[in-house]
Amino acid sequence: MNVTAMFIVLLLTMPLTDGFNIRAINGGELFGLVQRDAGNALDHGFYRRGDCPPWCVGARCRAEKC
């Protein structure tokens, strides 16, 4: 496997690893309110930072309905 392929694989797996680590730090609650975003695999940790994902705006974000 060359360096380019390894780099692409690393980029694809980083969000999944990040989500797993966040769950482990938060006590491993897989289905708690903090972990409702399925391990940050899609939004790359928006909830952890307190921001809103790009597809959620305004009052929906403040009401946590995303």
Swiss-Prot record:
- Source organism: Californiconus californicus
Which Gene Ontology CC terms are recorded?
extracellular region
UniProt-recorded name of the protein? Conotoxin Cl14.1a
Extract the GO molecular function terms from the UniProt entry. Answer: ion channel regulator activity; toxin activity
What the record says about family reads: Belongs to the conotoxin L superfamily.
Give me the residues of the propeptide, which is removed upon maturation. Answer: 20-49
Has UniProt tagged this entry with the keyword Oxidoreductase? Answer: no
Entry PTM: Contains 2 disulfide bonds.
What keywords sit in the KW lines?
Antimicrobial, Cleavage on pair of basic residues, Disulfide bond, Ion channel impairing toxin, Neurotoxin, Secreted, Signal, Toxin
Q: List the disulfide bonds.
A: none
**Signal peptide limits:** 1-19
Where is this chain primarily localised?
secreted
